Amino acid sequence: LNTTTLESPFGELTLQRRPRRRNEVLQAWDAADRYLLNYLAENPPPKGSRLLLVNDAFGCLAAALSDYECISWSDSAVAHRACLENCAANQRNAPALLSSCEAPTGSFDRIIYRLPRNHSYLRYQLQHIAQLLRSPDVFIGACMAKYLDSSSMAVFSESIGEAAASLAWKKARLIHLQSLSPGAAVDDDSLALDSSELGISLNNRANVFSRGKLDRGSRLLLNALGDLHTPYSLADLGCGNGLLGIMAGKRWPETALHFFDESYMAIDSARHNVRDNLPGAAAQFYARDCMHGYDGAPFDTIVC
């Protein structure tokens, strides 16, 4: 299995996943990406079109469609980094990058959508996309068939309009909009988490991990904080909503706190939760691939 070379209607591409692993057995694209590219080759956007690429995992779509004006909208800092790396490696024009916490604006000739598995995030994105559509045929979505269920189609119906799935090709399906819902609104995507037992308030954006409950790993680590010596500088790696760092800050008010996550929505949630629970705290926030690119002082404690 060739894990790096994609033969597409838009040319041959050499693509790599991130994080990099020796003897990689997974590809930086899947059949849903190929299905989308085949569809776009058969139904090409006009030359000079402006395209919104949503949830392009490793930049496969951006590299293939680089002759167009592309904007990559994603919640993943890792995806954005991989996109830039793969475009550079193939000498393709890189897209403009837009984080999930920013709403895309302007007119788009095509909106090319990879469905996320998280229904809260799906709803959030579709509600924003609905504000951009002037006709159903501007939108084309895709996912692997095993991730498409009646609940996902119901979110389409509630958020943007009636949708239909294509026949499967290599276990992938395209999603076409058949109609647009009039007056579709954008809801507040934040969800308050019941954290009264901890004496703090937490709000989570749509794509934050375990946003509706306190996960087991966090409970375990919270219990372990009491065994640590007072840190001078602490990193909350994969911080999610910032719970561990916040509880560390309440225990050790003089500790410098650093929050890392690859999810823009996680970092946004952590920033707001720190502001609400630790006003005036010395905290820094980083949306990136682990600690890649961090060149500050070393940490004496890392929670993860």
Give the positions of each predicted feature.
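Short loop/turn elements that flank and shape the SAM/SAH-binding pocket of Class I
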Residues: S100-T105, C290-Y294
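Conserved SAM/SAH cofactor-binding pocket of Class I
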Residues: W29-A94, R216-P298, C304
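General small-molecule cofactor/ligand-binding pocket signal
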Residues: A96-S99, I140, S166, N203, ...
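Glycine-rich phosphate-binding "P-loop"
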Residues: N23-V25, I112-N118
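N-terminal auxiliary segments of SAM/dcSAM-dependent transferases
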Residues: N2-T5, R117-S195
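SAM-dependent Rossmann-like transferase core, predominantly class I methyltransferases
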Residues: R21-D30, Y35-E42, A168-P231
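Hydrophobic beta-strand segment of the Class I
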Residues: I111-I112, I302-C304
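N-terminal, charge-rich interaction modules
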Residues: N2-R34, D56
